């Protein structure tokens, strides 16, 4: 996990250094971007729907402290796919660097992509069932819309609902932390409490960065 994150950060540094010294506007990768965004929309929507189906079958509710099955772990397989999808998400940074879209290569972007991968490695090893289902549903839904936006942006720059996408992302973080606060406040021990506390702090940082981006952009 650490090796992959280190490789990602190395690419960001070295790739930026090299591309800024090359003449021209960078590579376009229209065909690859076209296919990539379609694949992401399909993958994210699948993970969202699959998690919802599992939640319904297992009788999970929106009230936190759902059953955590250590052995069967019905959510584990889709969480593994969710975790691996974060490797695919590194392509977002690849496109930004190779296209020289420097305005998009922000601290928020790099922080999000590097830390989310590490954080869900922890989930995959400790919080692989139960209440993690809600995160996959919310994140899968938001990313389905986000990659739809990226797909549309390949063809037009006039996308009126861009700011609403950012608002939805912040609502997602709010919902995640409501869940975390409930888990911590209720004394629920089915989902690892230490992981929940780390989750809460991390999501607060993400909400703050997205809120700052929203204020600066809109």
What do the PLM-derived regions correspond to, one by one?
Residues 1-138, 150-166, 171, 175-218:
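Membrane-helix and juxtamembrane interface regions of eukaryotic multi-pass membrane proteins
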Residues 141:
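Structured ligand/cofactor/substrate-binding pocket environments in proteins
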Residues 144:
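Acidic, glycine-rich loop-and-strand cores that form catalytic or ligand-binding grooves
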């Amino acid at each position: 996990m650490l090796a992959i994150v280190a490789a990602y950060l190395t690419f960001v540094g070295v790739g930026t250094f090299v591309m800024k010294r090359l003449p021209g506007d960078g590579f376009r990768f229209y065909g690859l971007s076209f296919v990539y965004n379609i694949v992401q929309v399909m993958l994210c929507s699948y993970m969202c729907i699959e998690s919802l189906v599992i939640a319904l079958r297992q009788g999970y509710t929106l009230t936190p402290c759902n059953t955590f099955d250590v052995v069967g772990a019905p959510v584990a397989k889709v969480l593994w796919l969710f975790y691996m999808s974060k490797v695919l998400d590194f392509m977002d940074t690849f496109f930004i660097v190779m296209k020289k879209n420097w305005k998009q290569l922000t601290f928020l972007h790099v922080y999000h992509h590097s830390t989310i991968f590490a954080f869900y490695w922890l989930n995959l090893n400790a919080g692989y069932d139960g209440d993690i289902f809600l995160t996959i549903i919310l994140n899968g839904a938001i990313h389905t819309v986000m990659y739809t936006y990226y797909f549309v942006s390949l063809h037009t720059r006039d996308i009126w609902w861009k700011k609403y996408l950012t608002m939805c992302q912040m609502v997602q973080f709010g919902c995640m932390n409501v869940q975390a606060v409930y888990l911590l406040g209720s004394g629920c021990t089915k989902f690892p409490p230490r992981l929940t506390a780390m989750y809460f702090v991390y999501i607060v940082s993400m909400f703050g960065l997205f809120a700052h981006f929203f204020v600066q952009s809109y």
